[in-house]
Amino acid sequence: MLFRSEAPKASAKQQTLFATLSDADLLTYGVPAEWLLDVRQATEDTLLTLVDHLPGEAAEALLELATGGKPRLLQPVATVVNPFDHPDAQRRFRVLSNVEELQRALEFPWEKWTVFLHPEQRQWVERDYSGPARVSGSAGTGKTIVALHRAVFLARTNPNARVLLATFSDTLSNALRTKLKRLVSHEPRLAERIDVYAMNAIGTRLYKSHFGQVNLATREIILELLSVASKEVGKYKFSLHFLYTEWEQVVDAWQLDSWEAYRDVARLGRKTRLPEQQRTVLWSIFERVRSGLAAQKLITYSGLFSRLASVLANSKNPPFDFAVVDEAQDLSISHLRFFAALGANRPNALFFAGDLGQRIFQQPFSWKALGVDIRGRSRTLRVNYRTSHQIRMQADRLLGPQVSDADGNVDDRRDTVSVFNGPPPVIHVLKSEKEEIKTVSAWLSEQLKTGVAPHECGVFVRSEAELPRARAAVEDAGVPFKVLDEHVETTSGLASISTMYLAKGLEFRAVAVMACDDEIIPLQQRIETVGDDADLQEVYDTERHLLYVACTRARDYLLVTSVSPASEFLDDLRL
């Protein structure tokens, strides 16, 4: 006997959403016959819980109907067509007819492999979306490649359109630009219509075109203004670190310009509760900072993007027809406001790719509240074809089985499947730096003997202070190398050495993660600067994410080393 969980019942006072639809229509939209009654009773309050129980095509159709859209009725498929080829069948079955194609891809020259799109993911690249869409998934599932191919697809199918391909940092935009060149090197005219930018870089460019010179307030200027204002107000003694994070993550992030706005804002990510009396004093401080910035005609990046959002909201000619955003988990509030205004809920205008487990730079916040509603247009990539099963399984131990955003969208990593095997990661806790250097050197030499090229090797450390250890290991192995800077340009024939902060967007066959010592990761300096015990968890989470990012840069081989005492994170990394 089959059992199904009960869908939530509608309140008698609430209006049902689908009562006027015929059974035939609901069935055509993909609603199973046994769920027809539940769908007819659905209200705004029960719909989101209900669609979790339904097939993907039915959930999408119902969400579009509920928001005023009219989804396309599915047509019967000719019997001569392979039913497994239908997009809705491919949601639930992974027919491994492309194993040979994947095997050939794994044997590609490295430059070609780094832009390979798994055939199963082409549907998300070429899909027609009625509003903002997002693909997510753990490291190795191909999110960046999907975003890259999506940008090219939009430019190719819209010959007069301009496409923005944006990402979090200059480092990542350089990596994306390199991949784009590899992908469309034979189509220069198409490439000219795809602008690849870091977020702050495109913001600065557009701001200059609308308002002229950009005078940015530095961190040092803001700290000085906070210090002076705090002394002037007195009354409560807040640490400068607390004041700066409250300014950065709440006041400036949300562009609060009045006491009422600050009093009423939901302080997501700020775990210390503040009574109204303390908030009143804090606002007196922040008001002085705002006045100080205005007097010096300075602006923050949050202010810059908020002004741009206001301009775009009232413009009929956006600078870009489409925007594709990689590393979307690190978008700020003002970044998302900017994209909401740029996309204006036009079909296909906004496409995001990101992994909540790789969030390093931003506090969580609600996308829906800012006008970017991805319900029904959010997909989790579950086929990992860029990282071996063994590396993925161990790296995932650094994170929980589920990660969620502020809107309740959940990424469940337990359903991810890797499509190829490799040797298990090697973890060594050594007695001295000298022993660690020798161990990594021997490991690198062994990789080269097995056919791994120097440029297919990467060595990562937590920060610049540990770079000499990495350099010594690579030099000892006799491997030519390059220490990456913010341009993150890997060079054929040279191994890459880098800090973990520059690791995003990179991929290597063999990766060594060195210097995972106690007090290095998590970094003791960060822990000591936490002005509030409740913020400590955020430090630990982002430090875990850093190590996760570094480990998942490896496709086939992973070595993790430390000098005793080792980071506590290595206990989690071990099986």
Regions found by a protein language model. Give the residues of each.
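ATP-hydrolysis module of ASCE/P-loop NTPase motor domains
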Residues: 3, 11, 37-57, 209-278
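N-terminal accessory nucleic-acid engagement/regulatory domains that precede
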Residues: 3-103
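Proline-centered turn/helix-capping motifs that create local helix->coil transitions or kinks
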Residues: 91-94, 252-261, 400-409
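N-terminal pre-Walker A segment at the start of P-loop NTPase domains
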Residues: 96-118
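Conserved helicase motor core of SF1/SF2 NTP-dependent helicases
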Residues: 110, 114, 118-162, 168-216, ...
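Catalytic/regulatory signature loops of cyclic-dinucleotide turnover enzymes
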Residues: 228, 557-558
